[in-house]
Each structure stands twice: as structure tokens, then as C-alpha cells.
Amino acid sequence: MSARFYGVISPFITPFREDLSLDREAVAWLARYQAEKGVHGIFPNSTTGEFVHLSREEAVEVTRLVLEAVGGKVWVIPGISANYTEDSVALGRTFKDLGVDGAVVTPPYFFKVSPERLKVHFSTILEKVDLPIIVYNIPATTGINIPVGLYLELAKEHSNLAGAKATVESFTYFRQLVQVVKAERKDFAVLTGLDDLLLPVLMMGGDGGIMALANAAPQIHREVYDAYRSGDLKRALEAWHKLLRLVRVYDYATSFPTSVKTLLKVMGAPVKPYARTPLTPETREVEEKIAQIARELGLKI
């Protein structure tokens, strides 16, 4: 049985106007653009989408706009992360009613709970939300590194645990997800959250990634994915090296959201570079460095 979710998924940025209100037209445009450029799925209300800066109503509105824009062409898998378990449940049920394809959830990110309490948190959500759910490990922001053993327990006990997104730099962690959890549940998706690990994770037996730069240039990620899946390792390596050149954007920017928004701006997209405070737009100097990368790779709308 193949994984429920796979390939190239974008953690959707949230476009804002200069007054930091939602830019609904840009949301719809960007969702259509990503679908046309080859993403398999879109993850609104994400880390890159500044979900911690959105009200519940805004999270629902962005997800609704994305659903309408893509019209069923790609998966829509919104985030339901919250510090209170029942808030995640309520948001998941709301998204279920909207017609989404799944959901993504991180650990609580304020109180650092024990593995036992973390299992209760995820189990409650998996039991109460009737959707395929990706459990997202991002210790840099949550302060919690989800043990591989916990994924295994959840995978055995909850058939709607669809997989793991892991934003970690450890090859060992991904190897264990594949060899321990995926060996138990063949339909368990192993997804990287880091653009530059896409090919290594695929080669270890993973299924793809949910990567920030897929907001702007998912065609490069697709080139890596498609070449590897077709058995053309030479072409996959060439595409991966192109992706590694694009990843330099992160070397200059101050955050994932602003790096992507700046890249889209210099590519000519109708997406403004504004982010909600304490994040702020990148400086003109950073913008020019990112523009140079885009020019080198021939990226323009």
C-alpha cells in the first residue's frame, strides 16, 4: 500500500497587504500558480504561513480560498496546531466540514509536555478528527523532538495517522522513520520539511517533502521527485543541485515566510513581501541577493 500523501507539498505562505490584512486575491492566485507548477498538495495555516499570527477565522478563510482556487486538483491539508488539544480538534472538524483532504498538527509549542502527555494530545486529535493526519516534528520551534517510538505507537493504534513531516537535519531520524515506522505501516508517509533533504530522504525510502521553497518554484522540486521516481538518478542529482542553489535564499533571509515572500516578489508574482510583526520584510540588500539567485536559475513568473 502506498503512502496517502507523497511528492511535493507546499507549506502555503499567507499573503498580506501593506496594512497586514489578508490579501485574498493573492491567496487565490498563489494556490492556482502552485497547482499549475506541479505541487501534489498545499498546506495552509503552516509554519511558513505564519499560522501563529492568524486568527481562527483567518485560518479558515485562507483554507477556504485555497480549496476554491485549486478545485480538487491537488490535496489541501491545513494545519490544526494549537496549545490546547481541544482547539486542534475543533479546527480539524471545521476543516473536515470544508472538504479538506487531511490535516497537519505539531506538538503543543508553549508547555513542554512529556512523551506520555504528548501521546494523549495526538491520540485525542486522531480519535476525534475524522481526517488523515500528518504529525509534524519541528523541534526548533516547538522545543519538542517527537521520538520515533511515539510515531510507531500512534501508527499501530490509529489508522488515520497518515505520516510524519520532520523538519530536522538528522539522517538517522529519517532512516528510523523508514525502517521502524514505515516498515510497520507501508502507507505511513515520511516527509522532509527541508528543501535540501528532498533527494536524500527519497533515497532512504521516504515519500517526499513539505518544503517552503515549493511556494515559489515547485517545478524544481518536482524535477527532483519525478526523476528519482522514474529511476533517472543522474537527472535527479542534476535537479537536486539546482535546488541546492535555490536554498541559498535561506542564507540571506531572516525567516522562512519572508524568504519565500521576497523570492516571489523578485520573480514578479502578485504577492507582497509583508509579514506580521515581529517579522518584517527583508531589506533591499537581502532582496537584491535573492533576486540574483532567481536570475541565475531563470525564475520568473
From Swiss-Prot:
InterPro entries: Aldolase_TIM, DapA-like
Keyword Iron-sulfur: no
Example of a GO MF term: 2-dehydro-3-deoxy-phosphogluconate aldolase activity
Keywords: Cytoplasm, Lyase, Schiff base
Record's keyword annotation contains Cytoplasm: yes
Taxonomic superkingdom: Archaea
Pfam family, one: DHDPS
GO cellular component: cytoplasm
Active site: 47, 136, 165
EC number: 4.-.-.-
Compartmental location: Cytoplasm
Subunit organization: Homotetramer.
UniProt record similarity statement: Belongs to the DapA family.
Descriptive protein name: Uncharacterized DapA-like lyase Tpen_1666
Organism of this sequence: Thermofilum pendens (strain DSM 2475 / Hrk 5)
